[in-house]
Amino acid sequence: MKKTFYHYMMKHRAALFKNEISDLAEAMYDDLSFPKQSEDYDVISSYLELSGMLESMSIFDDAWDLYIQER
């Protein structure tokens, strides 16, 4: 069974060393409207762009690349 992007990112919460990806994971956790069941890049990317959660979408792109590598 594949993990959703949200489920994958939860392992980055409460990281020992804070970085942009761990900050994104915390923000996703706090956002009750985040599309938690999605595995679709376009759905998640659009949501993040419209929500204004990120200063730069490159943070999401980096997190997505890690997600794809570990699937």
UniProtKB/Swiss-Prot annotation:
<comment type="similarity">
    <text>Belongs to the UPF0346 family.</text>
</comment>
<dbReference type="InterPro" id="IPR023089">
    <property type="entry name" value="YozE_SAM-like"/>
</dbReference>
<dbReference type="Pfam" id="PF06855">
    <property type="entry name" value="YozE_SAM_like"/>
</dbReference>
<dbReference type="InterPro" id="IPR036806">
    <property type="entry name" value="YozE_SAM-like_sf"/>
</dbReference>
<dbReference type="InterPro" id="IPR010673">
    <property type="entry name" value="UPF0346"/>
</dbReference>
<protein>
    <recommendedName>
        <fullName>UPF0346 protein BcerKBAB4_2120</fullName>
    </recommendedName>
</protein>
